[in-house]
């Protein structure tokens, strides 16, 4: 079995989504990661922040951070694919952690 690597995913949720829908969205994307072999260590809202420029017609959004470990890139690829087509996620970024 290959060694587990640490990753951090940051994504921005549109600001006009209600709390119940945002919770469902976060749960859905956490489940996508775990169903594809990743282990979610931490998944939490960072803050609602104003953008330097408009993204998708919005001037602000809620940043959500997920820390996880994965042995392969299946979970990351599926998260990337589905977040690109989801209208509630304005932007996302996946970073490999070195710590």
UniProtKB/Swiss-Prot annotation:
Top-level taxonomic group: Bacteria
NCBIfam families reported in the protein's UniProt record: S6 (TIGR00166)
Protein name per its UniProtKB record: Small ribosomal subunit protein bS6
InterPro entries assigned: Ribosomal_bS6, Ribosomal_bS6_sf, Ribosomal_S6_plastid/chlpt, Transl_elong_EF1B/ribsomal_bS6
Organism: Lactiplantibacillus plantarum (strain ATCC BAA-793 / NCIMB 8826 / WCFS1)
UniProt KW keywords: Ribonucleoprotein, Ribosomal protein, RNA-binding, rRNA-binding
Role played: Binds together with bS18 to 16S ribosomal RNA.
GO MF annotation terms: small ribosomal subunit rRNA binding; structural constituent of ribosome
GO annotation, biological process: translation
HAMAP family per UniProt: Ribosomal_bS6
Gene Ontology CC, one term: cytoplasm
Pfam families noted in UniProt: Ribosomal_S6
Similarity section: Belongs to the bacterial ribosomal protein bS6 family.
